[in-house]
Protein backbone atom coordinates (compact mmCIF):
# COMPACT_ATOMS: atom_id res chain seq x y z
CA UNK A 1 0.00 0.00 0.00
CA UNK A 2 1.09 3.56 -0.47
CA UNK A 3 1.52 6.11 2.26
CA UNK A 4 -1.39 8.55 2.65
CA UNK A 5 1.06 11.36 3.52
CA UNK A 6 1.97 12.85 0.13
CA UNK A 7 5.62 13.72 0.90
CA UNK A 8 6.23 10.10 1.97
CA UNK A 9 4.31 8.42 -0.82
CA UNK A 10 7.37 7.33 -2.82
CA UNK A 11 8.42 8.36 -6.27
CA UNK A 12 8.74 6.47 -9.51
CA UNK A 13 11.54 8.46 -11.13
CA UNK A 14 15.09 7.88 -12.38
CA UNK A 15 17.75 8.31 -9.72
CA UNK A 16 21.53 8.65 -9.90
CA UNK A 17 21.75 5.83 -7.34
CA UNK A 18 21.68 3.49 -10.33
CA UNK A 19 25.48 3.82 -10.29
CA UNK A 20 25.63 2.52 -6.71
CA UNK A 21 26.78 -1.01 -5.95
CA UNK A 22 23.54 -1.49 -4.03
CA UNK A 23 21.24 -0.58 -6.90
CA UNK A 24 21.17 -4.24 -8.02
CA UNK A 25 22.34 -7.19 -5.91
CA UNK A 26 22.53 -10.99 -5.97
CA UNK A 27 22.62 -13.37 -3.02
CA UNK A 28 22.51 -17.14 -2.58
CA UNK A 29 20.95 -19.09 0.26
CA UNK A 30 20.15 -22.72 1.03
CA UNK A 31 16.54 -23.43 0.11
CA UNK A 32 16.36 -25.97 2.94
CA UNK A 33 17.71 -23.54 5.55
CA UNK A 34 15.30 -20.81 4.49
CA UNK A 35 12.43 -23.29 4.52
CA UNK A 36 13.30 -24.28 8.07
CA UNK A 37 13.07 -20.66 9.18
CA UNK A 38 9.59 -20.11 7.70
CA UNK A 39 7.96 -23.49 8.39
CA UNK A 40 8.36 -24.99 4.92
CA UNK A 41 10.44 -27.76 3.41
CA UNK A 42 13.05 -26.64 0.86
CA UNK A 43 12.03 -23.23 -0.55
CA UNK A 44 12.18 -23.34 -4.35
CA UNK A 45 10.70 -19.99 -5.31
CA UNK A 46 9.97 -16.51 -4.00
CA UNK A 47 7.50 -14.32 -5.87
CA UNK A 48 5.80 -11.02 -5.12
CA UNK A 49 2.05 -11.40 -4.56
CA UNK A 50 1.26 -7.85 -3.50
CA UNK A 51 2.95 -4.61 -4.57
CA UNK A 52 2.60 -0.89 -4.02
CA UNK A 53 1.94 1.53 -6.92
CA UNK A 54 5.70 1.72 -7.66
CA UNK A 55 6.01 -2.06 -8.12
CA UNK A 56 7.81 -2.58 -4.80
CA UNK A 57 6.62 -5.82 -3.22
CA UNK A 58 4.68 -5.50 0.02
CA UNK A 59 4.12 -9.26 0.33
CA UNK A 60 6.24 -12.15 -0.96
CA UNK A 61 5.20 -15.79 -1.38
CA UNK A 62 7.69 -18.53 -0.59
CA UNK A 63 6.87 -21.95 -2.05
CA UNK A 64 8.50 -25.31 -1.39
CA UNK A 65 8.80 -28.39 -3.58
CA UNK A 66 5.60 -29.86 -2.10
CA UNK A 67 3.59 -26.79 -3.14
CA UNK A 68 3.16 -25.41 0.38
CA UNK A 69 3.35 -21.63 0.62
CA UNK A 70 4.04 -18.97 3.22
CA UNK A 71 3.51 -15.25 2.66
CA UNK A 72 5.92 -12.84 4.36
CA UNK A 73 6.68 -9.15 4.31
CA UNK A 74 9.89 -8.04 2.59
CA UNK A 75 11.26 -6.99 5.99
CA UNK A 76 10.67 -10.45 7.48
CA UNK A 77 12.31 -12.10 4.49
CA UNK A 78 15.33 -9.79 4.73
CA UNK A 79 15.65 -10.71 8.43
CA UNK A 80 15.45 -14.44 7.64
CA UNK A 81 18.05 -14.06 4.89
CA UNK A 82 20.36 -12.05 7.16
CA UNK A 83 20.13 -14.77 9.83
CA UNK A 84 21.39 -17.20 7.17
CA UNK A 85 24.36 -14.96 6.32
CA UNK A 86 22.87 -13.36 3.22
CA UNK A 87 23.89 -9.89 2.12
CA UNK A 88 20.49 -9.06 0.61
CA UNK A 89 19.98 -5.33 0.99
CA UNK A 90 16.21 -5.18 0.66
CA UNK A 91 13.14 -7.29 0.19
CA UNK A 92 12.71 -5.98 -3.34
CA UNK A 93 13.33 -9.29 -5.09
CA UNK A 94 13.20 -9.18 -8.87
CA UNK A 95 13.98 -12.83 -9.61
CA UNK A 96 14.53 -16.12 -7.78
CA UNK A 97 16.03 -19.28 -9.22
CA UNK A 98 16.44 -22.66 -7.53
CA UNK A 99 19.16 -25.08 -8.58
CA UNK A 100 20.74 -28.00 -6.68
CA UNK A 101 19.54 -26.87 -3.25
CA UNK A 102 20.57 -23.24 -3.69
CA UNK A 103 18.14 -20.37 -4.10
CA UNK A 104 19.69 -17.47 -6.03
CA UNK A 105 17.94 -14.15 -5.51
CA UNK A 106 18.40 -11.05 -7.61
CA UNK A 107 17.06 -7.84 -6.16
CA UNK A 108 17.20 -4.09 -6.16
CA UNK A 109 17.73 -1.34 -3.68
CA UNK A 110 18.90 -0.88 -0.16
CA UNK A 111 16.38 1.03 1.90
CA UNK A 112 12.73 1.04 2.75
CA UNK A 113 11.55 2.62 -0.52
CA UNK A 114 10.06 5.75 1.02
CA UNK A 115 11.61 9.18 1.13
CA UNK A 116 15.11 10.25 0.30
CA UNK A 117 17.55 8.00 -1.51
CA UNK A 118 20.87 8.58 0.26
CA UNK A 119 22.99 7.51 -2.71
CA UNK A 120 20.94 9.54 -5.18
CA UNK A 121 21.03 12.61 -2.93
CA UNK A 122 24.79 12.38 -2.57
CA UNK A 123 25.22 12.06 -6.35
CA UNK A 124 22.95 15.05 -6.96
CA UNK A 125 24.88 17.15 -4.43
CA UNK A 126 28.17 16.22 -6.12
CA UNK A 127 26.61 17.38 -9.41
CA UNK A 128 25.86 20.77 -7.84
CA UNK A 129 22.16 20.36 -7.08
CA UNK A 130 21.20 22.39 -4.00
CA UNK A 131 19.79 20.89 -0.84
CA UNK A 132 16.37 22.51 -1.30
CA UNK A 133 15.95 20.94 -4.73
CA UNK A 134 17.16 17.57 -3.43
CA UNK A 135 14.61 17.69 -0.62
CA UNK A 136 11.86 18.77 -3.04
CA UNK A 137 12.64 15.80 -5.30
CA UNK A 138 12.56 13.40 -2.37
CA UNK A 139 9.60 14.85 -0.50
CA UNK A 140 7.21 16.46 -3.01
CA UNK A 141 4.70 18.76 -1.40
CA UNK A 142 6.67 19.13 1.83
CA UNK A 143 7.36 22.64 3.11
CA UNK A 144 10.66 23.64 4.68
CA UNK A 145 10.17 25.65 7.86
CA UNK A 146 12.29 26.94 10.72
CA UNK A 147 10.86 25.73 14.00
CA UNK A 148 13.32 27.31 16.39
CA UNK A 149 14.75 30.73 17.14
CA UNK A 150 13.41 34.02 18.50
Where are these regions (language model features)?
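Conserved, single-site charged/polar hotspot
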Residues: 1-150
Amino acid sequence: TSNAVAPLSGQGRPCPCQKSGRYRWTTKVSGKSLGGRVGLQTVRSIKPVQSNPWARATKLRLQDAQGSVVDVSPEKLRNHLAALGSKAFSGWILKSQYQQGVLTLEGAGFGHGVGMCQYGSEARARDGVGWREILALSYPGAKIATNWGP
